[in-house]
């Protein structure tokens, strides 16, 4: 099925690309989320008329994401207190929701889906490097310090 992308889609293309995808992927994911429209003659003409508007909107979203990434970097680090044993191992773990809540409490709104933990959840005390994907092209790094609760 031919579709016109209205947004950048990972491993597929960027705004304005006409790509061939499976019908189910287009019908169940791309079209309902507003990331693509079927490539009919009417839609192609409509898209070409609105291309500049859509590109400007995409640039605004990217600029907002870069501003959020800059705010995250300005924080420097976030401290999370958790119960821990004598050897520095946590009772439980610190996951994406805990990190997102701590960063939001520090003043930058982050959804738990934007937190990237390449080594899995945090299970030890100390400093951990955590990355945030605030946009498909924009990443931010932050130190998360896990301390023992008193």
From Swiss-Prot:
An individual GO BP term: translation
InterPro entries: Ribosomal_bL9, Ribosomal_bL9/RNase_H1_N, Ribosomal_bL9_bac/chp, Ribosomal_bL9_C, Ribosomal_bL9_C_sf, Ribosomal_bL9_N, Ribosomal_bL9_N_sf
Molecular-function annotations in GO: rRNA binding; structural constituent of ribosome
Keywords in alphabetical order: Ribonucleoprotein, Ribosomal protein, RNA-binding, rRNA-binding
GO cellular component: ribonucleoprotein complex; ribosome
Keyword rRNA-binding: yes
Membrane-spanning segments: none
Pfam families: Ribosomal_L9_C (PF03948), Ribosomal_L9_N (PF01281)
Purpose of the protein: Binds to the 23S rRNA.
Entries under PANTHER family matching the protein: 50S RIBOSOMAL PROTEIN L9
Protein family membership: Belongs to the bacterial ribosomal protein bL9 family.
Protein name: Large ribosomal subunit protein bL9
Classification of source organism: Bacteria, Pseudomonadati, Pseudomonadota, Gammaproteobacteria, Enterobacterales
